[in-house]
């Protein structure tokens, strides 16, 4: 009888789930549950790590959240295990600990510490105990054999530059390599902040970055000295302490830091130096890519470092895996996800100073690589390479990264598989990240109830015209429906803070949204539009600054680019909006790079665009280029391209315009450009 009473409810359950948009998601429930268990285990492991450090050092309860403490722990637990492979050089975790100890001692000398003629003997590790003594207070560091000399002569590498002070920021302008890591870890051990400076910056942008993070010293690669020579007077005028990371003929006042490091003993330094007062203290600055202006110095906290230790565990990577990393270390993907993520599980990383598509698979075979960390462009480079024997005999089982376009994704897996691709989404300064743990092509993550319970976020309606979220009459934001593009936001909390940028609170303007769903709440604004489909998969739609309006409709640059990339004669596409005099909004423009040895087929291109895009989304202008303008992490320069416009008298690239009357893309001559400005050419 009871079963008969429950029967109507059971029959109505699918309808209820369908109404709540949950029915299509049920097929993915096993994967959602499996990832939720993994995520909870990861959180528990990180918490246990922090608690173990607190128990070992009651006076520094936050010490276990520091990078220095984790390295010291690995040097004890996995001393002989290979941590780093760079070319022919290999370093174990214990060797990494000793190398970073040398670097820490060199930096502490610049702070005014006197280790004595034999370098002293601290008697404790970075994770150990010790009497608290602020360096610079004039007291001897307990058990360290070092005294703070202070004053004159404390800083040795920068000539007339001011000595370093406790807690100062030291900027690194170095290529990816072991020395980058030892200096970074050494700075962390010495209680100093590090700033990762993009290696391509020079002149104004470089000086801006150094000023914004308050750098007091700069360590630069010797190979950069020639291009930096015009900047040296300005760097000295800023009072920067200057070092070169290697031998050579250096300008006056610049000494070889690596020589100073090698002269130090490799004994540990006092652990209290690297123990943060608060887990949200800033320990690192990483600069944003600067696609929309000058780079901003994102504040990276010890909490972020701890969270990034769990990245590879979340991805299902194990401590016996070998990770291939060919990304710049001055960006989060290389340093925090790649290096810190590897340290989180105690695995091995094969570090490349520069990515080589032709050498990649041979490297993977030589070092028995099992995990490859990518950004989308690297995968595209690989699929565009001619076939080789090495690409089929590898042991790579997992590719983890971001920015992989669906067409490249399919070609990559079909050609180099079987392997799993885990596409992720995240921001350097953000408090939200997603992982496509199912491998569904084209998705950057899942919006399952389980995932959002562990890592909360929301998609809210957004007006691309006003650049603001759409709010209801009560002033609250509204969640999107399945298939509707929405602004990705995440609640700011003690566990998921937003620390902003160095240089002033005005730099974070617009990054925080208040009263989103209820009075008083605060959410981080990612500035990215995502779409959640009826199965709960998240797909990247566009950046808010990239989406534009034309003919009263919203145009997503990524969607237009995907249509273009289906053409076999196109290798790269960059879509953006340009202002056209006499027209509202912005017209679409596409910069194209041909795939050798193909030629541009304007007739096929027009037919393809007309069949696959609505009229308002079809680019009005084309620009043929040898290569696309990108940042060093291969992010397309849309703002720069939009500012350059489409004037044939100022651009040397071949330009084309969509002539609606003719129904074709025609060369944009000076005459047609004048006709367009006069309103005689309909676009």
From Swiss-Prot:
Domain of life according to the entry: Eukaryota
Biased composition (Gly residues): 119-128
Enzyme Commission designation: 6.2.1.15, 6.2.1.3, 6.2.1.-
Entry binding sites for ATP: 288-292, 331, 428, 528, 543, 635
Annotated stretches, region: Disordered: 119-145
Location, primary (coarse class): mitochondrion
Biased composition (Low complexity): 133-145
A GO MF term: long-chain fatty acid-CoA ligase activity
Keyword vocabulary terms for this entry: ATP-binding, Fatty acid metabolism, Ligase, Lipid metabolism, Lipid transport, Membrane, Mitochondrion, Nucleotide-binding, Transmembrane, Transmembrane helix, Transport
Stretches that traverse the bilayer: 3-23
Localization per Swiss-Prot or TrEMBL: Mitochondrion membrane
Matching PROSITE patterns: AMP_BINDING
Enzyme class: ligase
Membrane topology: Single-pass membrane protein
Expression tissues: Expressed in bronchial and bronchiolar epithelial cells (at protein level).
GO biological process terms on file: fatty acid transport; long-chain fatty acid metabolic process
Reaction catalysis annotation: a fatty acid(in) = a fatty acid(out); a long-chain fatty acid + ATP + CoA = a long-chain fatty acyl-CoA + AMP + diphosphate; hexadecanoate + ATP + CoA = hexadecanoyl-CoA + AMP + diphosphate; (9Z)-octadecenoate + ATP + CoA = (9Z)-octadecenoyl-CoA + AMP + diphosphate
GO cellular component, one term: endoplasmic reticulum membrane
Family, similarity comment: Belongs to the ATP-dependent AMP-binding enzyme family.
Function of the protein: Mainly functions as an acyl-CoA ligase catalyzing the ATP-dependent formation of fatty acyl-CoA using LCFA and very-long-chain fatty acids (VLCFA) as substrates. Can mediate the levels of long-chain fatty acids (LCFA) in the cell by facilitating their transport across membranes.
PANTHER family: LONG-CHAIN FATTY ACID TRANSPORT PROTEIN (PTHR43107), LONG-CHAIN FATTY ACID TRANSPORT PROTEIN 3 (PTHR43107:SF12)
Protein name (Swiss-Prot/TrEMBL): Long-chain fatty acid transport protein 3
Source organism (scientific name): Homo sapiens (Human)
Organism taxonomic ancestry: Eukaryota, Metazoa, Chordata, Craniata, Vertebrata
């Amino acid at each position: 009888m009871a079963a008969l009473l429950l029967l109507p409810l059971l029959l109505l359950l699918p309808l209820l789930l369908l109404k709540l948009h949950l029915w299509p998601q049920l097929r993915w429930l096993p994967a959602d549950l499996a990832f939720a268990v993994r995520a909870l285990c990861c959180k528990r492991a990180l918490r246990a790590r922090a608690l173990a450090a607190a128990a070992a050092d009651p006076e520094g309860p936050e010490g276990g959240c520091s990078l220095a403490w984790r390295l010291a722990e690995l040097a004890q637990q996995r001393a002989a295990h290979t941590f780093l492979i760079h070319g022919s050089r290999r370093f174990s975790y214990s060797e990494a600990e000793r190398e970073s100890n040398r670097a820490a001692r060199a930096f502490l000398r610049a702070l005014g510490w006197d280790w004595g003629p034999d370098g002293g003997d601290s008697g404790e590790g970075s994770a150990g105990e010790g009497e608290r003594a602020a360096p610079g207070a004039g007291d001897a560091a307990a058990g360290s054999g070092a005294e703070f000399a202070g004053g004159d002569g404390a800083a040795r590498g920068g000539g007339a530059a001011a000595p370093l002070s406790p807690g100062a920021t030291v900027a690194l302008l170095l290529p990816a390599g072991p020395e980058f890591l030892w200096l970074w870890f050494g700075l962390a051990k010495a209680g100093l902040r590090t700033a990762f400076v993009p290696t391509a910056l020079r002149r104004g942008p470089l000086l801006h970055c150094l000023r914004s993070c308050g750098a007091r010293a700069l360590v630069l690669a010797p190979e950069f000295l020639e291009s930096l020579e015009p900047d040296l007077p300005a760097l000295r005028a800023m009072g920067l302490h200057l070092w070169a990371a290697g031998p050579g003929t250096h300008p006056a006042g610049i000494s070889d830091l690596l020589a100073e490091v090698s002269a130090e003993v490799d004994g540990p330094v006092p652990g209290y130096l690297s123990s943060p007062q608060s887990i949200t203290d800033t320990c690192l600055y990483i600069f944003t890519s600067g696609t929309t202006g000058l780079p901003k110095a994102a504040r990276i906290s010890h909490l972020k470092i701890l969270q990034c230790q769990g990245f590879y565990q979340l991805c299902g990577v194990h401590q016996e895996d070998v990770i291939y990393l060919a990304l710049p270390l001055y960006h989060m993907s290389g340093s925090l996800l790649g290096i810190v993520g590897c340290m989180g599980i105690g695995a091995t990383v094969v570090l490349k100073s520069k990515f080589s598509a032709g050498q990649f698979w041979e490297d993977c075979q030589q070092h028995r690589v099992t995990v490859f960390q990518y950004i989308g462009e690297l995968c595209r480079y690989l699929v565009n390479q001619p076939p080789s024997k090495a690409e089929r005999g590898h042991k790579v089982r997992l590719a983890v990264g971001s920015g992989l376009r669906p067409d490249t994704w399919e070609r990559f897996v079909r050609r180099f598989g079987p392997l799993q691709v885990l596409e992720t989404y995240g921001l350097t300064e953000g408090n939200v990240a997603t992982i496509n743990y199912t491998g569904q092509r084209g998705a950057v993550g899942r919006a399952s109830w389980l995932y959002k319970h562990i890592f909360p976020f929301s998609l809210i309606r957004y007006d691309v015209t006003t650049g603001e979220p759409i709010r209801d009459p009560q002033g609250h934001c509204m969640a999107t429906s399945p298939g509707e593009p929405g602004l990705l936001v995440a609640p700011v909390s003690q566990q998921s803070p937003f620390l902003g940028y160095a240089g002033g609170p005005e730099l974070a303007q617009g990054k925080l949204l208040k009263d989103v769903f209820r009075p008083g709440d605060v959410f981080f604004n990612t500035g990215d539009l995502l779409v959640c489909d009826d199965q709960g998969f998240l797909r990247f739609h566009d950046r808010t600054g990239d989406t534009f309006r034309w003919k009263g409709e919203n145009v997503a640059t990524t969607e237009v680019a995907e249509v273009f990339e289906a053409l076999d004669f196109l290798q790269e596409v960059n879509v953006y909006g340009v202002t056209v005099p006499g027209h509202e909004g912005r017209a679409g423009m596409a910069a194209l790079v041909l795939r050798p040895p193909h030629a541009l087929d304007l007739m096929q291109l027009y037919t393809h665009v007309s069949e696959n895009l609505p009229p308002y989304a079809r680019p009005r202008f084309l620009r043929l280029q040898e290569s696309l303008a990108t940042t060093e992490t291969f992010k397309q320069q849309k703002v720069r391209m939009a500012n350059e416009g489409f004037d044939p008298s100022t651009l040397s690239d071949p330009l084309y315009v969509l002539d609606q009357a003719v129904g074709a893309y025609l060369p944009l001559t000076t005459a047609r450009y004048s006709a367009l400005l006069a309103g005689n050419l309909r676009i």
